[in-house]
């Protein structure tokens, strides 16, 4: 259904209403790119990560896809994933994911319209990991505990670096990296407060963080 909607949007891009709809989708997804929060996507049976909606998984910092033959899950790509909904750096999320390397982008493009199983999605580099049903809950728990062990402000900056890679624009400087590092890292109590990471560094005491990341 989602792929059919994407095809309709692509076929009618010259219509003013469709053009505005695509623009709204682009702006909405771009807000995820500059979010100060960690974003995880979970691809499970019944998920609808296809075409435009797969952009949400591509915008996430990590994506996990359940590999369970008894409860199959799948993702799918459409032409909307290849430039119609660019990030704030002007590039598609797939291009940014692969640092614009031609070979993996071409491999992904060759699979447009196909329902990709976990093994295929992982081989193409479209998801972070594809644990089986035995490891699924433990992998997610460990992933969340890893994030929770780090300063939320530091993560904001590190995640901004990973999301935009080597491609920088004025938008990413102001609303991505610069905003993260200047406003959320150097001057916040999590770094320089009495119980912050810099104050507690080398003391043997654990830093105490404010987990509100806005």
Question: Language-model segments: what does each one mean?
Answer:
Residues 1-56, 63-70, 109-120, 138, ...:
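C-terminal alpha-helix plus adjacent terminal tail
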Residues 34-38, 99-104, 123-126:
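Short, surface-exposed connector motifs at secondary-structure boundaries
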Residues 50-109:
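CoA-thioester-processing core
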Residues 60, 126-127:
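A structural motif
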Residues 100, 132, 149-153:
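Alpha-helical structural elements of signaling/regulatory helical domains
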Residues 127-138:
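Short, well-structured beta-strand/strand-turn elements
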């Amino acid at each position: 259904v989602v792929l059919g909607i994407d095809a309709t949007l692509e076929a009618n891009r010259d219509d003013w209403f469709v053009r505005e709809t695509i623009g709204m989708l682009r702006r909405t997804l771009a807000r995820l790119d500059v979010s100060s929060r960690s974003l995880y996507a979970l691809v499970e049976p019944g998920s609808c990560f296809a075409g435009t909606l797969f952009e949400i998984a591509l915008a996430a910092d990590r994506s996990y896809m359940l590999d369970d033959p008894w409860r199959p899950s799948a993702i799918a790509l459409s032409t909307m994933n290849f430039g119609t909904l660019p990030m704030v750096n002007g590039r598609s999320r797939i291009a940014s994911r692969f640092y614009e390397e031609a070979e993996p982008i071409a491999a992904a493009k060759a699979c447009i319209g196909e329902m990709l199983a976990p093994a295929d999605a992982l081989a193409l580099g479209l998801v972070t990991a594809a644990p089986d049903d035995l490891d699924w809950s433990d992998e997610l728990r460990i992933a969340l505990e890893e994030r929770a062990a780090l300063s939320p402000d530091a993560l904001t900056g590190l995640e901004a670096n990973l999301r935009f890679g080597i491609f920088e624009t004025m938008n990413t400087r102001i609303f991505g990296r610069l905003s993260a590092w200047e406003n959320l890292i150097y001057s916040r109590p999590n770094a320089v407060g009495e119980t912050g990471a810099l104050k507690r560094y080398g003391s043997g005491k654990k830093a105490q963080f404010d987990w509100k990341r806005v």
